[in-house]
Amino acid sequence: MGYGCVGGYAQITYKMQLRDFNRAALDSYPQRVISFQQTDSICHVTIQSSSVMADTSLLKVVKSAVVDPGLSYPSDVLPFLEPTSLIDYRLPELQTIADTLLGNEKNVWSIIWKGLKFASTYIEVFDDSLAMEIDKGNSFTADIATILRRRKGTCSEYTNLFIALMRSKSVPCRFITGYVYYPPQITGGTHAWAECYVNGVGWIPVDPQAGQLGFPVEIKLFAGKDYPDCGIKDLSDIVPLSIEIENDTYSRCKK
């Protein structure tokens, strides 16, 4: 994948039939719901998904943002600074990494990119067996201590590690679960990534596994403090019953 633009596309409109999703997550930046119709247990939805890298005015604000030392974030954002049993940034090993990697850095843009680079390279092996267990509902992702020890994981473990680094430096960060679709490069599949909160901007998508900002091909369906907090009953239920691209917009996107 490239820098936020797959195949050069900065905006994609998807038409889908969905079974399980969170409406607030679905209709939040960088997505917006264009049409929504409920039929029994199936929702017919059209959304527009945009690339952050193509939003130059937003990026200008993000690049100048600094960590809020007073933590004066909106009340609904504060929970995304808290540790969880799976994403516990208070672990001494994680704190050592965060302090070495990020030090006293206050620029949010720099913190995000350093965190992305570290998370995307620290995990060395994709864990197929763990992926199967998560798909079956037998695992809710590996915790930070396990990730640091094994250096193996799925997209969820890249995301957990990145979120821990962000929260350790007072950057609110949340766990995103959704679906990726952009043929012929991407035939479709469930995926996990993260979003960082920036004062004056809101939530910004990032993909820790790819080490990049979020892509417009990543369709956000759930958000939470960690994977269990997303409230997904069955991971297979978030796979769209049908999905097609109605249109897309080309744009030159550069880091």
Can you name each region flagged by the protein language model?
Residues 157-237:
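Hydrophobic/aromatic-rich core segments of domains that either
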Residues 67-79, 215-221:
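Short, cationic low-complexity segments
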Residues 7-9, 40, 110, 201, ...:
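Sequence-level motif detector for i,i+2 pairs with an aromatic at +2
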Residues 153-154:
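Active-site-proximal helix/loop microenvironment
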Residues 76-150, 161, 227, 236-255:
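Secondary-structure boundary elements
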Residues 3, 36-38, 146, 164, ...:
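Sterically constrained small-residue positions within well-ordered secondary structures
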Residues 10-11, 115, 194:
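Buried hydrophobic packing residues in well-ordered domains
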Residues 1-72, 253:
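Intrinsically disordered, low-complexity N-terminal segments that are enriched in acidic
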